[in-house]
């Protein structure tokens, strides 16, 4: 490991770690939105982010998830690069599965203001338990998204 990677200079004194350009982008990211190129047509957008990482709030161990978002744009669509950077900003933050799902969904709804949306988070097994958390703007959109995109999601019957 180089002295730069270890955070120590050759004299053994603690050295200030250099912030890399990707880290700067992630730290300062704001999700951008663009005008919908076809505002008079309803169409579905499916976005899959397979590498979401964050930390468990109890143990501090890393957690991993695949995020799948489906939405019908209204006036805006999301910029994928800034969305990716925004998702990367969660890497060193602490969340429960339910909290991160709802926080991400709320942020996207605020910026997109879509006609309908769904966010499905599939978390890697932890302690031999798999978790899937789904949130949606309404039950009708859940059914639309399921039928159109063949999502393996149904509303549980309680």
PLM regions with names:
Residues 2-158:
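N-terminal intrinsically disordered, cationic/polar leader segments
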């Amino acid at each position: 490991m180089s002295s730069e990677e270890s955070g120590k200079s050759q004299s053994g004194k603690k050295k200030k770690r250099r912030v890399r350009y990707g880290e700067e982008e992630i730290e300062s990211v704001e999700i951008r939105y663009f005008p919908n190129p076809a505002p008079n047509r309803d169409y579905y957008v499916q976005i899959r982010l397979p590498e979401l990482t964050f930390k468990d709030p109890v143990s501090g161990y890393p957690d991993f998830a695949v995020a799948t978002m489906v939405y019908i744009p209204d006036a805006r669509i999301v910029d994928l690069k800034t969305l990716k950077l925004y998702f990367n900003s969660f890497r060193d933050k602490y969340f429960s599965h339910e909290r991160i799902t709802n926080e991400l969904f709320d942020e996207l709804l605020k910026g997109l203001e879509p006609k309908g949306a769904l966010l499905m988070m599939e978390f890697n097994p932890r302690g031999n338990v798999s978790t899937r958390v789904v949130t949606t703007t309404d039950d009708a959109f859940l059914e639309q998204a399921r039928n159109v995109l063949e999502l393996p999601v149904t509303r549980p019957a309680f």
